[in-house]
Design a protein with these regions (language model features):
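Catalytic pocket-lining loop regions of alpha/beta-barrel enzymes
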Residues: 1-101, 128
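Conserved, mostly hydrophobic/aromatic
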Residues: 5, 50, 71, 104, ...
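Generic hydrophobic, helix-prone segments enriched in Leu/Val/Ile
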Residues: 82-87, 110-117
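Mid-to-C-terminal alpha-helical segments outside catalytic/metal-binding sites
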Residues: 95-100, 112-152
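Glycine-rich, Trp-frequent "lid" loop and neighboring beta-strands that shape
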Residues: 107
Length: 152
């Protein structure tokens, strides 16, 4: 499958992270699985959904080290504390350009998603790092089709 996907320049979207289903197997939804695939198929474009919640730190590590691996930010504003930490880490590790906008529609509209992301950018606590407005601007406005080498 991955050989053909890479050869045909397909994009793989992984639903990474938690599931509310008691039957869901979390061992197969961890971001490090995508790292393994990326090492074996470095030309394969992959996207991890939801910043890999609850494994956002691992998601940042995977997108940092693998050229063709990205993450989407869908639903990250719904857990502002987790979204804040993930975006601060993305800034510190210079991988904000590898984060794609997503709303998790139909659960949330793009408008609600964008408003939620800017609310995270407004969070401040003492001298702690914060999510820059420019980071949210970049995520919301960048051309994902070009990043993923897709045409409209």
């Amino acid at each position: 499958f991955f050989i053909e996907a890479q050869k045909n320049e397909l994009v793989i979207l992984w639903h990474v992270g938690a599931t509310p289903s008691p039957h869901g197997d979390l061992s197969i939804s961890h971001p490090l699985i995508i790292d393994d695939v990326a090492r074996r198929f470095p030309g394969l474009t992959q996207i991890m959904a939801h910043l890999g919640h609850p494994w956002q730190r691992e998601t940042m590590a995977v997108i940092r080290k693998n050229r063709r691996v990205f993450a989407d930010i869908s639903a990250s504003w719904a857990r502002p504390f987790d979204g804040y930490h993930a975006l601060v880490r993305a800034q510190e590790w210079s991988v904000t350009n590898k984060i794609l906008f997503g709303s998790d529609f139909p659960l949330w509209t793009p408008k609600v998603a964008i408003e939620g992301l800017y609310e995270i950018a407004n969070l401040r606590s003492g001298n702690l790092p914060y999510v820059r407005k420019e980071t949210i601007d970049q995520i919301v406005n960048q051309d994902a089709l070009s990043m993923l080498r897709l045409s409209a």
